[in-house]
Amino acid sequence: MFTQAVIALIGLVSIRTGKTEDVTPCTTNCGCWARLEKQITVYRGDYSAAEENLKENKKNFGKIIAATVLGSEKLKATVAPVLLSAAQIIHECEEALTTARPAILDAEKKVAELRALYDVQQKLKEGNGELQLHIQDDTNINTAKEVPKANLGNINKKGCADDLNTPDAATIDKTNIETEGPTPKVITHVHVEARCQRDGTPTNGCHDGQLGQNGKLEFSLTYDSKDTNDLATWLADTATKKQISATEVDFIGNLNTEANTAIKGLKSSNPAPACSKKIRDYKTIADNSKFNLMVTKALIGKTDAEAGQESKEPELAAAITKYYGTEGTKFEDQLWKAIERTPAYLGDQKKEQTTKIEKLETLTEVGEATARGLVKQLAAGAQARQTASGDDQSAENQCGGKKEDECKDGCELVEGVCKPVKQGEGENKEKTGTTNTTGSNSFVIKKAPLWLAFLLF
């Protein structure tokens, strides 16, 4: 009963872990060629996915940058908390890839070299080259037909096939990759195989008779992992093909061990944890430790708040719901769609064209559209200042020409000189008889960010 319970428990654990069975080592050139590809594929997908996700995040980050200039004041405020989180996500991924790239490149290089060696070994092994001497007309070797085959050391053109599962049926994944050792050295020796037939009878060897007419002397090369040398027995039975030498060869050296170490090292440098995050995902953005602070500053209006001064619930949740939907459920529609619908400007060498941020595909286009947006803002600001300056100068001229009894209707005497009434002062003087500080407050309000004014009023 106890034994049955243990067996059942082991079976249950195996099912829950979902662990792939450990597999036996490869034993053939093409089997090892396939096994290496399966091993590195376990991590290659994570690395390539990290690069692709970083590329996509950077593209979307460019849209955020463009929106900070081209967007409405409300959109700019909505973007502000996302900007910081998105930048940190991209930075962390780039840091991870800085470590990961050399690791995957080194592993890919070693695996490619080792697979190439297994492929070459397979071509050598299947070369089937021979040197055949067939004595025919007399006991002399003096015609081409007496050398019917002379391609000793031939290399087969066909190496290992593209289908990995044909030479190696094993399944390799993250549950068993750690148990994989270095692929074996399938070829460690090269042998000369020989056969000598003294006449037309296949069983008549050359060890007990002279090679003569219709005799055959044949040599070939074979490759394996054995040190077999049957020279001694062959000399007593030369009519039978045997390996008469065993020369040690090592095509691989330490490369199999180095490749195995490099592949397993990809686990520790895997960029997936840092690079699987997407900046268009609300939860990813909101997980940033400074997200609530930026919401407090940009969306609630407490611009002087710093760490530890973040707004609390329900104020914080209310702001998030207003701009991103309840717990970010409208993050895509209310932020990203708004960003992508925002007008942008590009030139076509002759005139400026209006497009949308979603159409900006490259960093160059983002840069141009943002620059053109800045130019428009600078031009608008300059125009506003020029208009204000003109109005001030006009008022100065109108009041300056008036006599003392005419100095009214927006003008006042200052030390005997008629000058324009400063904004707010006249009204305050009428109400209180003294100069109020409203003018100073008005200046502060004018200088506050437009988006803050939008939120507060």
Swiss-Prot record:
Domain of life: Eukaryota
Propeptide: 441-457
Biased composition (Polar residues): 385-397
Keyword Signal attached: yes
Lipidation (GPI-anchor amidated serine): 440
GO cellular component, one term: plasma membrane
Glycosylation sites: 436
Subcellular location(s) per record: Cell membrane
Signal peptide bounds: 1-20
Membrane topology qualifier: Lipid-anchor; GPI-anchor
Keyword line: Cell membrane, Glycoprotein, GPI-anchor, Lipoprotein, Membrane, Signal, Trypanosomiasis
UniProt cross-references to InterPro entries, sorted A to Z: VSG_C_dom_sf
Record region (Disordered): 385-406
Function: VSG forms a coat on the surface of the parasite. The trypanosome evades the immune response of the host by expressing a series of antigenically distinct VSGs from an estimated 1000 VSG genes.
The protein, known as: Variant surface glycoprotein 20
